[in-house]
């Protein structure tokens, strides 16, 4: 429809120019007597260009608003999913019993970082909605644009009236030329010419007013749309820059955790070492017997229920473990009483080094060894043995269930294997203190 209207306007202008040229050639009228002049044609063309420009800009603004609304709706859903995703990691890192393990720490950092990233995304969506989408939507339906378009439409109607009136003037003048001039015909001609002059004057005034209004609207559309697009880009840059900083920090924390794990001693836990039946090393051996452990290993509740005996006595493993026990484990139980009944005076009188103390206490059974407590353990069931950090315990046997049996401060019982580290040497004071408690 718009194309048809433009084509009709071009045809009218072409006909008007042809009529004006013919009349000039015949000498009936002067250049400004009937049809529009060049200034008016220029104004009309300018209004047509401005109308097309504002219409295209309005279409672009509608596309921007429609696209941003979909982007914000989708982004809001992404934020909800991302926050739930991050919360699951934080929950694992904060509520997991092994809260100090590398995975727990990494999960905590991961959840915290991704929650911050989603917070930045939420900020971005707020900026897009308030600073980009709303101003453009307001301009689409603003009064200045509608008023300017109303003036242009009024100008087009008035221009059509001018063309029609000019045609009427030409018709009357042609009649006066062909026949005798009557007073009535002359009066009608003058009235028609006067009407044409009034319409042309109104058209010029309205054309200037419509051109000014359309220029203001066009400038406003261009400037505001460009500014809002720049605000959109700045918001996107800020979001990606902040998200990148957060992810860089998370990456550094994860690398640090991996390096910390790689730099720690790489040795097997107690129960793995026992099941592998490795030969017992001598106290003076050069190889280290220290065992890498996880001080916050998870304690199975089912194992607590299996331990029935008094904490003062040595708790026996379950019947299933007894069936799997070897003659070597029976030898461990036979030597248990010998260690408990060893006289304290013999250890106190020895004047040798720490190796001599360890050898005197443990030489009765090669399968026994000393272990240093690296994490405290509070006994919560009969048969369990409480431990204190930096003290030493005599380990009698290591079960495949992750628990070990040993003596500590005159008491015997079970404790998690991961809470102690095997030692080749121990301070003499610790051994004397341990033996004195047993006596």
UniProtKB/Swiss-Prot annotation:
PROSITE patterns: SH3 (PS50002). Residues 32-263 form the BAR domain. InterPro entries: AH/BAR_dom_sf (IPR027267), Endophilin_SH3RF (IPR050384), SH3-like_dom_sf (IPR036028), SH3_domain (IPR001452). Residues 366-425 form the SH3 domain. Residues 318-358 have a biased composition (Basic and acidic residues). Highly expressed in flowers. Detected in seedlings, roots, leaves and stems. The keyword Membrane applies. It comes from the Eukaryota. Its main location: cytoplasm. It holds the Pfam family SH3_9. Residues 277-291 have a biased composition (Polar residues). This is SH3 domain-containing protein 1. Residues 277-362 are annotated as: Disordered. Keywords: Cell membrane, Coiled coil, Cytoplasmic vesicle, Endoplasmic reticulum, Golgi apparatus, Membrane, SH3 domain. GO terms for cellular component: clathrin-coated vesicle; endoplasmic reticulum; Golgi apparatus; nucleus; plasma membrane. Disulfide bonds: none annotated. The keyword Membrane applies. Lipid binding protein bound strongly to phosphatidic acid, phosphatidylinositol-4-phosphate and phosphatidylinositol-4,5-bisphosphate. Binds actin in vitro. Involved in trafficking and modification of clathrin-coated vesicles. It is found in: Cytoplasmic vesicle, Clathrin-coated vesicle; Cell membrane; Golgi apparatus, trans-Golgi network; Endoplasmic reticulum. SMART domains: SH3. Interacts with the auxilin-like protein AUXI1.
């Amino acid at each position: 429809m718009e194309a048809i209207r433009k084509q009709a306007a071009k045809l009218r202008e072409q006909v008007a120019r042809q009529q004006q040229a013919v009349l000039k050639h015949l000498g009936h009228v002067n250049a400004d007597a009937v049809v529009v002049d060049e200034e008016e044609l220029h104004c009309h063309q300018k209004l047509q260009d401005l109308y097309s420009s504002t219409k295209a800009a309005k279409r672009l603004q509608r596309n921007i608003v429609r696209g941003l609304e979909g982007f914000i709706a989708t982004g809001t859903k992404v934020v909800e999913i991302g926050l739930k995703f991050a919360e699951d990691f934080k929950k694992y890192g904060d509520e997991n019993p092994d809260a100090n393990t590398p995975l727990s720490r990494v999960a905590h950092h991961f959840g915290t970082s991704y929650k911050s990233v989603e917070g930045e995304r939420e900020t971005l969506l707020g900026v897009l909605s308030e600073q980009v989408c709303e101003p453009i939507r307001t301009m689409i339906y603003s009064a200045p644009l509608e008023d300017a378009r109303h003036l242009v439409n009024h100008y087009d109607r008035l221009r059509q009236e001018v063309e029609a009136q000019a045609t009427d003037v030409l018709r009357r003048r042609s009649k006066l030329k062909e026949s005798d001039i009557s007073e009535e015909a002359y009066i009608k001609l003058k009235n028609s010419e006067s009407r044409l002059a009034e319409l042309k004057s109104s058209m010029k005034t309205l054309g200037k007013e419509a051109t000014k209004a359309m220029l203001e609207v066009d400038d406003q559309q261009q400037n505001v749309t460009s500014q809002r697009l720049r605000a959109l880009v700045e918001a996107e840059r800020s979001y990606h820059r902040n998200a990148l900083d957060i992810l860089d920090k998370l990456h550094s924390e994860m690398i640090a955790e991996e390096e910390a794990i790689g730099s720690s001693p790489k040795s097997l836990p107690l129960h793995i070492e026992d099941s592998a039946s490795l030969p017992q090393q001598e106290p003076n051996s050069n190889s280290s017997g220290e065992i890498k452990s996880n001080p916050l290993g998870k304690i199975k509740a089912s194992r607590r229920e299996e331990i029935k005996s008094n904490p003062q006595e040595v708790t026996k493993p379950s019947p299933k473990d007894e069936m799997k026990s070897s003659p070597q484990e029976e030898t461990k139980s036979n030597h248990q009483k010998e260690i408990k009944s060893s006289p304290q005076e013999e250890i106190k009188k020895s004047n040798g080094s720490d190796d001599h103390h360890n050898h005197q206490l443990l030489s009765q059974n090669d399968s026994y060894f000393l272990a240093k407590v690296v994490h405290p353990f509070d006994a919560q069931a009969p048969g369990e043995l409480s431990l204190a950090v930096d003290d030493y315990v005599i380990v009698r046997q290591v079960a495949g269930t992750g628990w070990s049996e040993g003596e500590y401060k005159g008491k015997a019982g079970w404790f998690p294997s991961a809470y102690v580290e095997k030692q080749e040497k121990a301070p003499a004071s610790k051994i004397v203190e341990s033996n004195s408690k047993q006596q």
